Amino acid sequence: MARTALKVKAKRKPKFKVREYNRCPICGRPRAFLRKYGICRICFREKALAGELPGVRKASW
């Protein structure tokens, strides 16, 4: 889990646009962020397996 200070820091508008970075709103993880869904890979997997993401299915071939 990310520190609360880092979560708050990421939400603030930076002085320069290039300093902005994505962070998972659920757990605060800055890496492995999926832009399409707006969450990190770990939270994505948990939500997908729980059926909370519409249109997402486990791959099978």
Curated annotation (Swiss-Prot):
Gene name, Swiss-Prot/TrEMBL: rpsZ
Keywords, ordered alphabetically: Metal-binding, Ribonucleoprotein, Ribosomal protein, RNA-binding, rRNA-binding, Zinc
Presence of keyword Electron transport: no
Chain sites annotated for binding Zn(2+): C24, C27, C40, C43
Cofactor note: Binds 1 zinc ion per subunit.
Function in brief: Binds 16S rRNA, required for the assembly of 30S particles and may also be responsible for determining the conformation of the 16S rRNA at the A site.
Protein name: Small ribosomal subunit protein uS14
Complex formation: Part of the 30S ribosomal subunit. Contacts proteins S3 and S10.
Gene Ontology CC annotations of this record: cytoplasm; small ribosomal subunit
Cofactor(s) the protein needs: Zn(2+)
Annotated family: Belongs to the universal ribosomal protein uS14 family. Zinc-binding uS14 subfamily.
Gene Ontology terms, MF aspect: rRNA binding; structural constituent of ribosome; zinc ion binding
